[in-house]
Structures are given as structure tokens and as C-alpha cells.
Design a protein with these regions (language model features):
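Conserved, mostly hydrophobic/aromatic
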Residues: 176, 193, 227, 255, ...
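Conserved glycine-rich "GG(E/T)P / GGGxP" loop and the immediately following alpha-helix
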Residues: 47-52, 188-219, 231-238, 265, ...
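Terminal RNA-binding accessory module
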Residues: 339-428
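Proteins enriched for Cys/Gly/acidic motifs involved in redox and nucleic-acid/cofactor modification
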Residues: 1-201, 238, 243, 249, ...
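Generic beta-strand/beta-sheet core signal
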Residues: 6, 75, 194-196, 228-230, ...
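Radical SAM/AdoMet-radical enzyme domain recognition
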Residues: 185, 210-224, 235-295
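Contiguous mid-protein beta-loop-alpha structural module that forms a pocket-lining wall or clamp
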Residues: 304, 319-321
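Conserved strand-turn element in the central/C-terminal portion of the radical SAM core barrel
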Residues: 159, 163-166, 225-233, 259-269, ...
Length: 428
């Protein structure tokens, strides 16, 4: 059976799709790209926003319309959070949650045998353990993601993810080390550790995120270890000190801000204020001279006044993020914020997004200007039209002239100029 995969959402979803791809291959099936003929399609959904749900439905209907005879498996966070709505999507032959991604192969083979529609969604349990399969590779990438944590117990008022993902659970250190060794042998030199609430890694255990970095960095072939999205209030001085001591650690800190206004942060049930965040960024930049701080910012949250938005805008400009992902608040049924007063219109959200993106791009441009004249080690990924592109340790995009394939190589590059969203350099 030829199987193709569609992935929406975060790096954890990308990892889990890769796990399903490997599981199908191990069972004797053939993974194929989306533009090749296929017998089955797996759609791994996201539900962080209403737009994510819309895109999932759109892909589902398109796949069914263009492939009426294919087996379609709908899984992921949308299914887990809104199972009855997912069940009603009759274009899917199999609807299954994300509690055990390994079972997608079993469901597909069962449907292939008897043709009966399958609906299997079980709730996450407090006693649930980390059970995501270990990967041996990561298709079509030069850096590998490694999922080391699942679940979230923080319950930000806007977020449905605790419902979709359950409580915090962590991958054992021995499994991290073993998977890193396997990825190293497969030719990967950089690993990105990812999770739903990554800084909660090790909660209730006798290890933490620093131990995870050290375990992933153990193989000689692994030259870089990067962290995914981080919660600011977990980043203590001791954590920064231990990360600094790990020579393979990449000094990019993606610290989820969400808002630069204290009143808004309080309504969001975030666990810090702007004073704490400002101090943390200062401490990071003191410990890591070449650090980049990147972030996510939400605009148009329930009750966000123009004054609150202006404070958030000013804070983003003050911090000077290397990169900012800007997105509009999406009202999600099942969250506290769904019932909050002061819901913002779509038009106002769009206008605030425009203003925030404008500020974010200005900060990014300024950050890249400061790299000019420096020599940075770049992990090259893509090549096109006589240019090769890759990323520095602090995740700045760099482009160089090159007619040869540099994919997967880490080379020193002298930064000679900067554009709005990338730098230009010469290989030394």
C-alpha cells in the first residue's frame, strides 16, 4: 500500500508524522510524497486555532475529492480535542486520536481487510506515560526533530492544547541518548528537541531539560542541539549556566511572550510579567553573547484595548527580537477565554497584526545588521539558482553563492551584508 502524509501544526506533529511514516514502512508499506499516486492518506491535524481546523477540513475534502478510492486516516489534535465534530467528517474512513500514533497502521490494515469505518478516540489519562516511538531518521531534512515531552498542565485561558494533549510526560534520558545515536549514524548533525511544553520536561522525575540536552549531545556526530519553544518562567539562572556549559547547545531562545502588556498576560493566565521577561532576556544576553531571542506574540486577545496593544507593541520593540511569529487570537470553545467579554473584531485583529508584524520585521532587520562582519558556522540546507542557504547556531538565515551541494555541511561563513530576513556571506 502506498501511503502519503499531510501534517498541520507544530514540530511535535511533524515528529509524530515521521513516526507514522516509519511505522508504515516497517509494516511493508511504501511512503510516497503528496504529488505521487497513493492508496492511503494520513492527515495529522492541528487545533491551536479555528484556522487550523478549517485547513484540516479543507485538506480532507480535497484529498477525498481527488482520490475517491483512497483510504483516508484523520488523526491529531483536532480529533482529540473535538472528537464528535471529527467523527462527523465522513470523508475520513478512519478517525483516531493522538494517544497512540503507532496504531494508525493497525487501523489502516483493519480497514483494508473489512472496509468498516473506524472511530477510535480515547481520553488522555493522568497516569499516561510517554509512548511516542523512537525515530531512526527524519525524511527530507538536514536537522532532525526529537520529541522529548508531551502534554501541558498550565491551562492558559486561550489554549485548548491541554485537552488535546493531556498532562506532562517525558521521554526517558536513555531513549534520548539512543535516538540521538541513531540519528547521528543516519547523518544528522543537528537535533532540535521539541515538546508541547518543553520546559516542563522532567516534571515529577529526577531529570530536567538540561539533562535532555546533554543526552542528545552525547554522540560525536551530533554537532548542535537546539531547543524548541520555551516557557519563560522555567528559565532559571542555574538552567542558563548548565546550558552555557554544553558546547553543542545552540544559543537560540524561543521564549513565548504572547503579550507585552501585564494586564493582558494576567487575563491569559501566563505565569510571568513583562518585568520578569525583560530581566530574563537581559540575563540570557549576558550569559550568551551571541544569543538570539525569538518569540510568539498574540494580538487581539479578549479584552485587549488599544492601550494594551500599544504597550505590547512597545515591549516587542524594546526587546528587539531576532524573529517574531505574530498571530491573531482565535476563540476556542472549551477554553476560559471563550466566555471573556471584549472579543475583538476580525478587522481590528488584522490591523493589529499588520502593525505588530511591521515592528517585528524592523527588529529582525536590525538584529541581522549586527551580524555583518562576523564569522558564523552555518548548517546548509537548501540550494537553488547558484545559491546555498542555511542557518547559524543562533538560527539566523544565511545565503552564499555556491554551485555545489552543501546540504548537511556545517561551514564557517563571513557575513558580508544583510537583507530584511537573511544575511549574505562568503564561505571562508
Amino acid at each position: 500500500m502506498k501511503v502519503t502524509f499531510y501534517t498541520l501544526g507544530c514540530k511535535v506533529n511533524q515528529y509524530e508524522t515521521e513516526a507514522m511514516r516509519e511505522a508504515f514502512a516497517a509494516a511493508g508499506h511504501t511512503p510516497v510524497p503528496n504529488d505521487a499516486p497513493f492508496d492511503a492518506a494520513v492527515i495529522n491535524s492541528c487545533t491551536v486555532t479555528a484556522e487550523s481546523d478549517r485547513k484540516t477540513r479543507q485538506i480532507l475534502h480535497k484529498v477525498r475529492r481527488e482520490n475517491p478510492e483512497a483510504i483516508i486516516i484523520l488523526t491529531g489534535c483536532m480529533v482529540q480535542a473535538f472528537s464528535e465534530e471529527a467523527k462527523a467528517l465522513t470523508d475520513a474512513d478512519i478517525v483516531c486520536g493522538n494517544t497512540d500514533v503507532k496504531k494508525t497502521v493497525e487501523y489502516a490494515e483493519r480497514f483494508l481487510k473489512d472496509g468498516e469505518r473506524i472511530f477510535e478516540v480515547s481520553e488522555h489519562k493522568k497516569t499516561e506515560r510517554f509512548n511516542t516511538p523512537v525515530l531512526s531518521s527524519f525524511a527530507e531534512r538536514t536537522r532532525a526533530y526529537m520529541k522529548i515531552e508531551d502534554g501541558c498542565d498550565r491551562y492558559c485561558t486561550y489554549c485548548i492544547i491541554p485537552t488535546a494533549r493531556g498532562s506532562v510526560r517525558s521521554k526517558p534520558l536513555a531513549e534520548i541518548a539512543a535516538e540521538a545515536e541513531t540519528l547521528s549514524r543516519a547523518g544528522f548533525s543537528e537535533i532540535v528537541l521539541v515538546g508541547i511544553n518543553l520546559t516542563s520536561y522532567g516534571k515529577g522525575e529526577n531529570f530536567d531539560i538540561c539533562d535532555a540536552v546533554e543526552a542528545a549531545a552525547r554522540p560525536d556526530g551530533i554537532k548542535r542541539v537546539r531547543l524548541g519553544s520555551l516557557e519563560p518562567d522555567h528559565m532559571s539562572d542555574s538552567v542558563l549556566k548548565r546550558l552555557k556549559a554544553q558546547k553543542k547547545f545552540c544559543p537560540q531562545f524561543h521564549l513565548s511572550l504572547q503579550s507585552g502588556c501585564d494586564e493582558t498576560l494576567k487575563r491569559m493566565n501566563r505565569h510571568y510579567d513583562t518585568a520578569f521577561y525583560r530581566d530574563l532576556v537581559s540575563r540570557i544576553r549576558t550569559v550568551f553573547k551571541d544569543a538570539s531571542v525569538t518569540t510568539d506574540v498574540m494580538v487581539g486577545f479578549a479584552g485587549e484595548t488599544e492601550e494594551e496593544f500599544s504597550k505590547s507593541l512597545a515591549f516587542v520593540k524594546e526587546i528587539g527580537f531576532a524573529k517574531t511569529h505574530v498571530f491573531a487570537y482565535s476563540r476556542r470553545r472549551g477554553t476560559v477565554a471563550y466566555g471573556l467579554p471584549g472579543q475583538i473584531t476580525r478587522a481590528e485583529k488584522a490591523e493589529r497584526s499588520r502593525r505588530m508584524i511591521e515592528t517585528a520585521l524592523s527588529c529582525e532587520e536590525e538584529f541581522l545588521k549586527n551580524l555583518v562582519g562576523k564569522t558564523e558556522c552555518v548548517l546548509f540546507e537548501t540550494a537553488e539558482n547558484g545559491f546555498a542557504e542555511g542557518y547559524t547556531a543562533n538560527y539566523s538565515r544565511v545565503r552564499v553563492k555556491s554551485d555545489e551541494s552543501l546540504g548537511g555541511k556545517i561551514l564557517p561563513v563571513k557575513i558580508t551584508a544583510s537583507e530584511k530576513e537573511y544575511c549574505i556571506g562568503q564561505i571562508k
